[in-house]
């Protein structure tokens, strides 16, 4: 398919508005302020650069702030996000499997900066795990796409049903089901079932701080930080982990595992209240005592241009 019409989705140009308020005076370390101001400047310059490159290409495009995005994205051939993984995650909730997306990391972490400032504060910037481009290679990556030298990867997302009703939001990274108060105990049970009707032999009853399920793309995020393992990016499996289980006993080995595309997880919620957090704070749904939640990889895939695929294609030229 020829790509002629693009949407440029932007992280807010001023991502740190508090720098313009009196609150900024509470930051005593001047290097912190310089670092934050630098991040704003680098991001603004990246937006300007991407717009200049697009203006030279035979495409129609328009920019929009991610804060102004409120409806499904249609009638475009591709979405380009400029920001970090959070901006691409935000975009994913408005994109189905018909529109590919390219992420541009506008402010990548600088290893030398992190090292120089490590004794003062964390100077990490944007990881950009899902972003295939930066300012350094944006034009080359864009040309690879426009000339059809690279195709997007089909990345799995999580489908959710709440009391048998399908939720419209699909998680690209992960979901967390937990109490609204992080200090409260979550009570629930789950069972892995096959879509042909068979189920695992054991229902797992849990008291814990919640249940996290991730896709392959999300396995490098919170799941890995919690002790999970990194999955191949194109895997359709889902990984789950019960967070901080209380006295799991004989079910300890069942608290962290995976399930296949021909399976789903059936969760029964036994606390008074709960929340399904989809891709961090992107989307939330409330649950209550007695609710059932069905989790699977049945959601439409997201077509994402990944750096690995682009580097493979480029090595042929």
From Swiss-Prot:
It is found in: Cytoplasm. Its EC number is 2.7.1.86. Coiled coil: none annotated. Two-fold decrease in activity in the presence of PPi, iodoacetate or para-chloromercuribenzoate. It catalyses: NADH + ATP = ADP + NADPH + H(+). Transmembrane segments: none annotated. One of its GO terms (molecular function) is NADH kinase activity. Keywords: ATP-binding, Cytoplasm, Kinase, NAD, NADP, Nucleotide-binding, Transferase. GO terms for biological process: NAD metabolic process; NADP biosynthetic process. One of its GO terms (cellular component) is cytosol. Ubiquitous. Optimum pH is 7.9 at 25 degrees Celsius. Phosphorylates specifically NADH. Can phosphorylate NAD with a 100-fold decrease in efficiency compared to NADH. Prefers ATP as nucleoside triphosphate substrate. Can also utilize UTP, GTP and CTP. Key source of the cellular reductant NADPH which is an important antioxidant factor. Belongs to the NAD kinase family. Homodimer. This is NADH kinase. It comes from Arabidopsis thaliana (Mouse-ear cress). The lineage of its organism: Eukaryota, Viridiplantae, Streptophyta, Embryophyta, Tracheophyta. The gene is NADK3.
